[in-house]
Each structure stands twice: as C-alpha cells, then as structure tokens.
C-alpha cells in the first residue's frame, strides 16, 4: 500500500466514524409519519355490498374462503394461495391453484381499504373480485351453476338466513357459465334468461359474503410502523424498531431520490395527502 492510499484509508475511517447514524430532515420525518399504519383511516362503508357489515355474511364468507369444495376439482380454496399465517399471500413468485398462474399472490391484509383490485386494478369492488378466481381455470376452476348447487346442498340454511330464499335449481344444469369451457358456455346459453339471472344472483351473493369476511382482515403492526410511531413522537426508536444505518439510508432513498413513495405512499395506497400523483384517490 502506498503512503498516499493508507492515508486515504485512515481519513475514510475517520469520516465514517464521525458520521454516526444518518439523520432524517423534518420533511422526511413528516413523510415517514404519513406512512404509518396508525394513519390508516377507518374502513369506509362498502356502498356496493349491502351485506358488507352483516356478521352472518362475514361468517359464511369465512367458511367459503377456506373451503376447497369451492373449486372445480375440490382441491383449491382462496386460502390455498392467500394463507392466513402469511398476511394472506403464499411467498411464491407465481400463484399455483389448479394450474400455475402468471402472477404473484397479493397479500390481503387491509385489502378492504383499496379502491380497486388485482395488480392491474381490473376490478373495482371486493365482491366482484372474489368471483374471478372461482371461475378462473388456473385458480379454482369452478363454474357458477356448480357453485349454486353446492351452496344449496351444503350451506342452504345459512345462505337463506342472510340472502333470502334460494331459487328452485331442479332445471339448472350441473355445470354452466358464460365464462367456462365450450360445454359450460353452451349449457349457459341454453338456459332461460330468468334462470341465468337467478344463478347470477346466488353467485354474486357468494362474492358478497366473501367480501364481508375480507373486511375483517386487518394489517398487523410491523417494525416499520413502530419505527414511524417512535420517530413521530420524537423518541429514539428502540428494540426491533431501531433501524440499522442501511435501513435508514434505504428509507431515505425510498421516500426521496428513488421516488418509490410516489406510488407506495401509505397503508394500502389510502393516504393520498402526500405525493400521490399516479394512483388518484376515489
Ligand atoms: C391460485 C391462487 C389463488 C387463489 C385460489 C385465489 N387467489 Fe386471490 N389472488 C391471487 C393472485 C395471483 C392475485 C393477483 C392476480 C392478478 O393481479 O391478476 C390475487 C389477487 C387477489 C385480490 C386482490 C388484492 C388487491 O390488493 O388488489 C383479492 C382481494 C383476492 N385475490 C382474493 C381472493 C379470494 C376471495 C379468493 C377465493 C374466492 C382468491 N383470491 C383465490 C391468487 C389466488
Ligand atoms: C409508478 C408507480 C410505482 C413506483 C414509482 C414504484 N412502484 Fe413498486 N409497484 C408498483 C405497482 C403498481 C406494483 C404492483 C404491480 C406489479 O407487480 O406489476 C409494485 C410492486 C412492487 C413490489 C412487489 C410487491 C409484491 O408484493 O410482490 C415491490 C417490492 C416494490 N414495488 C418496490 C418498489 C420500490 C423499492 C420502488 C422504488 C425504487 C418502487 N416500488 C417504485 C408501483 C410503483
């Protein structure tokens, strides 16, 4: 090592030691506080679902969420991918149901706060979202006529106490759906309109019960939330809330130069008072 470079090394050690832990500016502290779970507003009423806050609907929805009977082959439920002990996701790069999908399972903690659903936001109500995996051939691979028969046979009484009388299903084919296989679509098209309407109503109510359950899936407090709370209170974050220098520098980037916070701007995209230019409030 030359004399010059050893001197440089000494200077660098001295500079790094003198730096200590990186600090946040007041503006950064304000942004961090805005990202804390405690800033999550109370759940708004779901104006698309009359049963959203009916406890019996949520209870039935919870049964259906975990029931593998709610699939074509009887092997997959919502909870196959949305696992209760992993914030309702599965740690896989791509979700696997009846087949392998091309997307990652989204966590459901706090999902009822979202204005729209799926990675691409292609559903705008929680109950309509729930119907999609039920008929997706790679996920639950069922069809609405089969689900309607299943609900009547298995949960008829519980269903009727919430949603009123089930229709007469004697003329409804075992398998039929406007989105299914060729045979299922042909069976669906052959059904009288009023009968298709009745099946659609039961299918929609399945979604509404599941959505009522999903309103109860609250996000747990994380290390980040404890860190943000301590920081907002002017206290030195302690225990697992104490961030390492790398974590602090990463957070500075996240809310600063790297612009992540433009989109990832609060618990479930809801704190729109800061930064939010890409995902507008609804
Ligand atoms: C095969 C695995 C799998 C099954 C089964 C499954 N999901 Fe999902 N879920 C996913 C994947 C993957 C996504 C993202 C898919 C996309 O964006 O196209 C997702 C997205 C969602 C979302 C959107 C979350 C958000 O923040 O936008 C909700 C809500 C949801 N699922 C609920 C359900 C319900 C309810 C069921 C059962 C009726 C279910 N899922 C069944 C894998 C699954
Ligand atoms: C323009 C908006 C936008 C910006 C800026 C942005 N993200 Fe994202 N990010 C998204 C969206 C939308 C998704 C989910 C959709 C997808 O995967 O295509 C996502 C997904 C993610 C995921 C995956 C989450 C999961 O559960 O699989 C991570 C991690 C992530 N972003 C981190 C970051 C980081 C770190 C930055 C800054 C360097 C950043 N994002 C900047 C919009 C954004």
Language-model-detected regions and their locations in the chain:
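Periplasmic c-type cytochrome electron-transfer domains
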Residues: 2-5, 18-282
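Bacterial N-terminal signal peptides
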Residues: 6-15
